[in-house]
Amino acid sequence: MEIPDQFLVGATGPSVARVLIAKTSLDGHWRGINVVSRALREGGFEVILAGMITAETIARVAADEDVDLIGLNVGGRVEVVERILDTLQAQHVTAPVFAGGTIPHYAAERLEKRGVRCFPPGSSLEDIVTAARELTGHA
């Protein structure tokens, strides 16, 4: 799947980590995803801002674009994130995943057991960018 240039933001080049950012709910809240995308871009990442797409599309874009990291806006829908994780695994996509937004405590524990780094509301942008560097090996 070809990603239009207007959705590719940040630095580019072979040594730059690529991050796919997607929403998992129709909650209408875009501020968090936009702020995190900008922080990652300013932190030196190439960001593919995909918006609201299906689990299958997330897996396809992640594979086609050879992303180094996948970021998901949870919106309180942990079962959707788990479906995305299952789809990524089935499609052999091994990029690490981080999730932000409204994540109930019990859900964060479930996701973290599956290797997802969780960032609830109020997490600092510095912590998110630092974690992205650690997860991609671009520290």
Give residue spans per PLM region.
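Cofactor-cradling patches in redox/metallo enzymes
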Residues: 33, 37-118, 122-124
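ATP-dependent carboxylate/acyl-activation modules
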Residues: 1-48, 138-139
